[in-house]
């Protein structure tokens, strides 16, 4: 993810439907900070968030990746994913999340990868379950 992705990321992170389980959709400045945070993650850890693009057309679809998150005072590796509303339901979040999970275990030698999911976000939970994740805490 780079600064060149700002317009596409604004379309994604500024979308009320995509951000339904967050406090609110993000402003352009907030999205730029999100991109900066992702770039910082790459500089510090060697990984972060990726843009999801269509293999053939290069059209923007969403984002996915691995980031360190603090959960109850413990640093955990999280897989996250967001897909534009018009591309949801096509297995793209599952494909991206699955690739991230493999990268976490096979390349980064992670012992655990988590997904922080709002309990009401059943679509995201189904993605996590499809890639073999299980609920361990509510």
Which ranges hold each PLM region?
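A short helix-loop-beta-strand connector motif used in the catalytic cores of GNAT acetyltransferases and
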Residues: 38-51
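Acyl-donor (CoA/ACP) binding surface of acyl/acetyltransferases
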Residues: 1-21, 49-138
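Short amphipathic alpha-helical/adjacent loop interface patches that line ligand
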Residues: 35
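Short glycine-enriched, charge-decorated loop/helix-capping segments at active-site entrances
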Residues: 25-26
């Amino acid at each position: 993810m780079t600064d060149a992705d700002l317009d596409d990321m604004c379309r994604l992170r500024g979308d009320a439907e995509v951000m339904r389980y967050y406090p609110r959709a993000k402003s352009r400045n907030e999205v730029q900070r999100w991109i900066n945070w992702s770039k910082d993650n790459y500089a510090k850890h060697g990984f972060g968030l990726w843009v999801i693009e269509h293999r053939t057309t290069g059209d923007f679809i969403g984002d996915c990746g691995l980031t360190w998150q603090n959960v109850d005072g413990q640093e955990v590796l999280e897989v996250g994913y967001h897909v534009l509303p018009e591309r949801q339901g096509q297995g793209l979040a599952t494909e991206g999340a699955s690739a991230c999970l493999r990268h976490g275990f096979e390349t980064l030698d992670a012992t655990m990868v988590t997904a922080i999911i709002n309990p009401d976000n059943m679509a995201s939970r189904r993605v996590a379950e499809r890639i073999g994740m299980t609920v361990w805490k509510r």
